[in-house]
């Protein structure tokens, strides 16, 4: 279980993963329990609502509305309070990590004035902030961020080689080992064959994979559109 290094005798229940024994770990335990309670109560209510709308098409809007209007605000409000109250210890770091999983970029920006130097000095916090900066750079309406790799012949290839040339470019991120990716290839092929003469370009970007496996999958799946390979591990 997780616990916070603190002066005193720290006890961790290996069955419940609950840390006790010091003031900081008691606060950590209470924070985790409160977050779990907010989620459990919210999702229990959603389960009841689902009984009224078992159809997936009817259910999805209900789920989204309740989560956005009830669960998420309650969760973020509590976590923000914990961050501000614990900006110089591990409880605040935990709350910040959990907050980052539910907030949007505007909410993260608004939080920056509330956290202190200690939290900002942590590598975990810096990595999270970097991720949100990347999200802002790649948000809808922003210029695309170029991607570089090589094509199947080993020549350098970039996303910018295809975007801005007067075509519609559909970027498909995939890997030879990704079963859901492979299952979608026939659908992409149908779309590509239907619209390729009307300005549609599909660019496959194969990631987290080995070149020989990518090449074999391209042949096996009859992928006739351009590919950009990123074989870095």
Q: Language-model segments: which ranges?
A:
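Conserved redox-active cysteine motifs that mediate thiol-disulfide chemistry
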Residues: 167-169, 173-190
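A non-transmembrane, solvent-exposed segment enriched in polar/low-complexity residues
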Residues: 1-74
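Structural microenvironment flanking redox-active thiols in thiol-disulfide oxidoreductases
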Residues: 182-223, 231-233
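N-terminal targeting signals for export/organelle localization
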Residues: 2-5, 10-11, 72-143
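N-terminal "domain-start" segment that seeds a small globular fold
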Residues: 126-161, 228-230
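Generic beta-strand/beta-sheet core signal
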Residues: 150, 171-173, 205, 228-231
